[in-house]
Amino acid sequence: MKKNPKISLIGSGNIGGMLAHLISLKNLGDIVLFDVAEGIPQGKALDIMQANTLAGSDIKIKGTNDYKDIEGSDAIIITAGLPRKPGMSRDDLISVNTGIMKSVAENVKKYAPNAFVIVITNPLDVMVYVMLKESGLPHNKVIGMAGVLDSSRFNFFLAEEFKVSTNSVSSIVLGGHGDAMVPLARYSTVKGVPIPDLVKMGLSTNERIEKIIDRTRNGGGEIVALLKTGSAYYAPAASAVEMLESYLQDKRQILTCAAYLQGEYGVKDLYAGVPIIIGKNGVEKVIELQLTTNEQALFDKSVDGVRKLIEAVK
């Protein structure tokens, strides 16, 4: 990857602005901040660059309303679309955001066909599928931000439960980025010790872990209900930057993301949250975990929900 990659952010709302801030603090590359609303990306770009003078970052940020400015991008993160409001599920956004995603995909195809694309817009698993099909980009270069965020929430709740640092917790959340996601306690650990073993030691109970799993599934909804006028943006932005960094720096991290499946986990031609290796080629490998019968059934149920939503937009 070249010394100063070009990173385009499509959508300059709360997540888009936070992405620009985090990317510039990490000096990952120069940024194009795009939005259809005049003045918003330009104002945020100016504000963030002025903040960067205090952080020692010389990253350049261009605010724009012209898609041509994304030309030649090395990586693109898409947040454009309506956010959730209290009482809404991610799936309620499907009609409006599908139209927006198709428009974005056309411009990505036109101006940045070699970019690595991360989709954040909800309903995530459908939007990333629309991006793949409409843009014509290779599937290893189009992924969705889901599992990194869901796992970070699961990690946080588990760290609270066991009263340990979040750095000691590692977890995996599979499936669609929705209410039927599958947090896997069996594959989640505290300093290498699986959660079921910690339960056997008397450090928690199965009932408490199930409550944590339910809270993880509703993690986004909990924040929407508290904010009342928007949805989460700090953690989603941080999650996408983790994925971006692994690609730009060829870190080959194992991260749970919405990836295009071609038979893995018994699923074909769909996106679902699974562990993948992200390196300089995008998705380097899909890691197929051995699931129990019950875990596979939960995963299948989650994926079936995604499949039905995709049929609705075809």
UniProtKB/Swiss-Prot annotation:
GO terms for biological process: lactate metabolic process; tricarboxylic acid cycle. Substrate binds at residues 84, 90, 122, 153. GO terms for molecular function: L-lactate dehydrogenase activity; L-malate dehydrogenase (NAD+) activity. InterPro entries: L-lactate/malate_DH, Lactate/malate_DH_C, Lactate/malate_DH_N, Lactate_DH/Glyco_Ohase_4_C, Malate_DH_type3, NAD(P)-bd_dom_sf. Pfam families: Ldh_1_C, Ldh_1_N. CDD domains: LDH-like_MDH (cd01339). NAD(+) binds at residues 11-16, 35, 97, 120-122. It comes from the Bacteria. The active site is at residue 177. Keywords: NAD, Oxidoreductase, Tricarboxylic acid cycle. The keyword Nuclease does not apply. It catalyses: (S)-malate + NAD(+) = oxaloacetate + NADH + H(+). Its EC number is 1.1.1.37. It is an enzyme of class 1 (oxidoreductase). SUPFAM superfamilies: LDH C-terminal domain-like (SSF56327), NAD(P)-binding Rossmann-fold domains (SSF51735). PANTHER family: L-2-HYDROXYCARBOXYLATE DEHYDROGENASE (NAD(P)(+)), L-LACTATE DEHYDROGENASE. Catalyzes the reversible oxidation of malate to oxaloacetate. Belongs to the LDH/MDH superfamily. MDH type 3 family. This is Malate dehydrogenase. It comes from Rickettsia bellii (strain OSU 85-389).
